[in-house]
UniProtKB/Swiss-Prot annotation:
GO terms for biological process: glycine biosynthetic process from serine; tetrahydrofolate interconversion. The keyword Transferase applies. It is found in: Cytoplasm. It comes from Prochlorococcus marinus (strain SARG / CCMP1375 / SS120). Pathway: One-carbon metabolism; tetrahydrofolate interconversion; Amino-acid biosynthesis; glycine biosynthesis; glycine from L-serine: step 1/1. It catalyses: (6R)-5,10-methylene-5,6,7,8-tetrahydrofolate + glycine + H2O = (6S)-5,6,7,8-tetrahydrofolate + L-serine. InterPro entries: PyrdxlP-dep_Trfase, PyrdxlP-dep_Trfase_major, PyrdxlP-dep_Trfase_small, Ser_HO-MeTrfase, Ser_HO-MeTrfase-like, Ser_HO-MeTrfase_PLP_BS, SHMT-like_dom. (6S)-5,6,7,8-tetrahydrofolate binds at residues 121, 125-127, 354-356. GO terms for molecular function: glycine hydroxymethyltransferase activity; pyridoxal phosphate binding. Its main location: cytoplasm. Its cofactor is pyridoxal 5'-phosphate. This is Serine hydroxymethyltransferase. CDD domains: SHMT. The modification N6-(pyridoxal phosphate)lysine is found at residue 230.
Amino acid sequence: MHTINSDLRNTDPDISFLINQELLRQQTHLELIASENFASEAVMEAQGSVLTNKYAEGLPNKRYYGGCEHIDAIEQLAITRAQTLFNAEWANVQPHSGAQANFAVFLALLNPGDTIMGMDLSHGGHLTHGSPVNVSGKWFNAIHYGVDQTTKVLNFEQIRQVALKNRPKLIICGFSAYPRTIDFKAFRSIADEIDAYLLADIAHIAGLVACGAHPNPVPYCDVVTTTTHKTLRGPRGGLILCRDKEFGKRFDKAVFPGNQGGPLEHVIAAKAVAFGEALKPEFKTYTFQVISNAKALAKRIQERGISIVSEGTDNHIVLLDLRSIEMTGKKADSLISEVNITANKNTVPFDPESPFVTSGLRLGTAALTTRGFTEKAFIEVADVIADCLLNPEDLSIKEQCKAKVIDLCNRFPLYNSNQ
């Protein structure tokens, strides 16, 4: 007879085994995917709680279901902490993802066929910023700006000219693979010139923004969206922020009933825990270490003769341009995976290769910094990556690299306290 009191190992040994295998993989690999991080055990405890049982359509104290008094308190804590963290007057913590946060903004501000302007995906933008394969590029007239061909950084006069020519109703500033600081004030000036809304998608840099390691878009943008994982180190989910409470009500309605039903209150509780962690001084220390580590990683890789897009980084992202060593991103990704390093192939600006092959490799320092890596350890990581990429056919070097990775994993253990 089935009982809800049976644990996972007894109820479903197959899933239990696979979860433990994934834990082992995370513990024995170096995680350099820029969009990933390691949530705390407290965050995971909240997400795996009895809150998963509760339906709570609506907002705190305005629900369509009974029995929400504790849910209301939890969600209000998440809202208040998010407002404090980002100095925002309004927040909605219900979006299931960053993509759904963006769609809620589109629903609130746009009509099908309106013109939107975002960063070109191949230059570091995101699918939801108007890519033709995404609903944002199918429902709206999407135009794009990119980086300067020489410097590989944003050229605001070029962006201004694109905006003046096309006069979009919404400008999106944000990225998934841009390693430099975003000047939100400059974007605001362009948006004001054409009377456009301005959306900042800070999914990758939210943790940096929260701690003052990157400028805050809230004072300059009409609305801000983000994920709650990545550099914020929370559960996988979305968040919408706004500097004006009345304007924010548009997005409340766009989230529910606009494009979601019941919120995931177990995830919202985990968001609240993560926001609470991010408000502590040690998280600020962590965030600045993330950036220092990225700079050390980029510098060492350049010293080994591999080019870096824009010649460096201001955040957690290091984007390798592998044309400098006549290698594709697909090949590089495969090589480092053989020595237990996970990253991802990525297009670089003006990439001659297809998105399935690419000329780039995107690295991020957030996850390994959570494990305790500092600059010295990241120099070791850079050398392992360079050794792999510069000696693709040397099996002895490959074995040495894998041994170094295992040593680094042992020196900086993950989730070892209760395992």
